[in-house]
Amino acid sequence: MASLAVQDDAMAALGGVSPLIRSGRIGDALSRLAAIEAGAGGDARLLQHLGEHYTHCGKPDAAARCYRRAVELTPDDPRCLYNLSAALIALGRIGEAEALLDRVIALDPQDADAWQNRSTLRRQTPGSNHVADLLKAVERVRPGPAEVALCYALAKELEDLGDPHHSFAWLRRGADRRRSLLSYRVETDVAAMAEIARVFGARLFDRPSAGCPEPGPVFVMGLPRSGTTLVDRIISSHSDVESLGEINDFALALMRLAGATGGKGDLIRRSADLDPAALGRAYLDSVAGYGRTRPMFIDKTPANFLYVGLIVRALPNARIIHLRRHPLDSCYALYKTLFRMGCPYSYDLGDLAAYMLAHRRLMDHWRSVAPGRVLDVEYEALVADQEAVSRRIIDHCGLDWQDACLTFHENTAPAATASAAQVRQPIHARSVGLWRRYADQLEPLAAALRAGGVDPAELV
């Protein structure tokens, strides 16, 4: 009974970690997790939960350690195997992860997430793919999330095999089903971005703003799937830089200082009146908990484009890099990605067009009111002339050039994004112009972008 009591105490202690993570107190959370892990012993359930919490703290190495111990204790538990595979993907151990997912599917053929994750790990080939098995699996599945995952897996593998017609048909089915499961109105996000631009007008930037004077971080931002992970890896291959990945610390610091609000509009209006120095300090105090070991760090949270007006006032020494990509390639890359959370606008072409147009308007606004603060990087230019554009990026960060920035694919740091497998490869142009394979299917999207003011020359 004593051991059961100890286990109950450990689970209770673990319950106190989640609020720390949600509030951005990562350092405190990691300290508690380490103490709980030290006493975890042979409790596979506790080790599983520890791994999940480490993952939420952006520590896939620690998560993998816990999941591996859990797998040793319960080697035929599909959940343990799946979670270990996810941690190994973030660590770049793609072959091991694929083998684990093979085991998951053998043990539990109904695990649609395992099918979908496995499809993304490499380019499928005529001699090595899972299309036939996926077609059988999708015939058996009920409408819902599992159907969505299998449809996305089929779309990915058929695209790899050079069958764009059937690939897009499965993608549309999966996206339509996912959209039907969401309660989301893109108009809310569009209105919020317009309100941000209104509140953070030119007059606000005329006010004196000391901000937090410490050397600032590098913010890499843009729409997801626009090349943010690639640029993050290029910069973090420098010996003076490490990446914290996609964290929410700036938004969390903002919400803590703003206090309880009456919704997005109220938060936006309150944020303009915050003390910039206090906001900058709150953010830097929060990220200190990640235990950095290098002088400079990267915050690669794509949605930070919403906060550029706050960032430049709160952190006057911050470096901001914004990724841009051909509008149709950008939207197609979003549309074909099954996000575990976030990006609810990405499952409908009309929503995608509306969100992209609002994003472009807001970025145009930031360039107008804070000229020179944002370095725009064109994904296509980076792919076409890697060294020249990489040097411009490193220079913008105030760093001396290092050749390691050209071999970013050898960077062993974790990458826990949808591009985790791709950034382990040298730069390539396979995805440039990929939208052209689907020009007919994407024409409604292109028409909406043209109607929204995008120069038709950008859409060819």
Language-model features: locations:
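PAPS-dependent sulfotransferases, especially Golgi type II membrane carbohydrate sulfotransferases
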Residues: 100, 116-119, 131-143, 151-217, ...
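Phosphate-binding active sites in nucleotide-utilizing proteins
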Residues: 211-313
